Regions:
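Extended, compositionally simple fibrous regions characteristic of intermediate-filament-like scaffolds
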Residues: 87-89, 173-184, 200, 256-257, ...
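Short N-terminal or domain-adjacent regulatory/targeting segments
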Residues: 1-32, 180-196, 270-289
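C-terminal structured domains
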Residues: 16, 24-25, 35, 52-53, ...
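A generic structural motif
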Residues: 63-73, 130-132, 154-159, 177-181, ...
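Internal, hydrophobic cores of structured domains that mediate oligomerization or house catalytic pockets
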Residues: 98-193
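ATP/pyrophosphate-binding catalytic subdomain of soluble kinases
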Residues: 178-230
């Protein structure tokens, strides 16, 4: 990554790569984008974000802008790197290429990502923001990026303080449409619980062995749907292994292994607000302390 770059230099490098990709004598490369994909990636999440990005290009070609906050860097600077990532589509000549822009936001720049990202957005295409880790509530970075994004994609399984973060999340609902990857992961269990209707309507307790984020979302969903209090018992686990209602195990749905790339790609196909998700999270905010 080159240190001390400007947005103008990033734009010039994009142009150079496009020109090089169209070199005479070779099969033409099609540069295509269906969106701008912003990703806010604190240092601890860089490897996971890179792995996820590697599997997304063919399904959702986009201009990806990786925003790498470095608030403790003593410099007031922007570091940058531009790359074209190309792949072959079956039955087509040449390659389809997407642009990946990596930007290190050093020192004060970590507080002003909106002014960095805005000039690089593709006009008239939707903007999806993948925020890695816990949202920085009250921080200018979150405020600026949700202002320019059409959809905010989170994963509550990434949150260390999951309970507290859930109670703050409703403040974003009227500002930006939200997806939660943990909500998608727990969908088969929600469907399995719904199949127990009408008996589940009298439920008093829920027991879940699984990640805290998915557990809270399942609990909040049941509270919101049944409009009643439920006692929660949680056992930590890497994935949801067991759900029990009033001591009776819910039949486990068929296991489906989905990559992190596919989980994120699924969220990039959703545009409207998910009111059922919002109600589930809002019910958690109403839980007495």
């Amino acid at each position: 990554m080159t240190e001390g770059v400007t947005i103008r230099q990033i734009e010039q490098e994009l142009g150079r790569l496009r020109h090089a990709a169209a070199a005479p004598g070779s099969a033409p490369n099609l540069r295509t984008s269906v969106m701008t994909h912003l990703a806010w990636v604190p240092e601890r999440w860089v490897d996971a974000a890179t792995d996820t990005l590697a599997g997304m290009g063919e399904r959702h070609p986009s201009r990806t802008i990786l925003l790498l906050p470095r608030p403790d860097d003593p410099r007031d600077a922007l570091d940058g790197e531009v790359d074209l990532r190309c792949f072959v589509r079956a039955g087509e000549q040449g390659q389809v290429c997407s642009e990946v822009i990596s930007l290190g936001l050093c020192g004060p720049r970590a507080k002003a990502p909106g002014s960095v990202a805005m000039p690089l957005l593709i006009p008239d295409l939707p903007v999806f923001l993948r925020w890695r880790g816990e949202p920085w509530f009250g921080d200018p970075a979150l405020d600026q990026l949700t202002e320019i994004a059409d959809r905010l994609v989170l994963d509550s399984d990434e949150w260390g303080e999951c309970d507290a973060t859930m109670t703050q999340l409703p403040q974003l609902f009227d500002r930006v449409a939200i997806s939660d990857i943990a909500w998608a992961k727990v969908q088969p269990w929600r469907e399995a619980c719904a199949a127990l209707w009408p008996d589940i309507g009298e439920a008093d307790s829920l027991r879940v062995a699984g990640p805290r984020g998915e557990t809270l979302l399942l609990w909040g969903w049941l509270r919101a749907r049944l409009r009643r209090e439920l006692e929660l018992e949680h056992e930590p686990a890497g994935e949801v292994e067991l759900v029990a209602i009033d001591g009776e195990d819910v039949p486990a749905p068929r296991a489906k292994r989905t990559s992190s790339s596919d989980l994120l790609s699924d969220q990039l196909e959703i545009f409207g607000r998910d009111r059922i998700y919002e109600e589930a999270v809002s019910s958690l905010a109403a839980v007495p302390a």
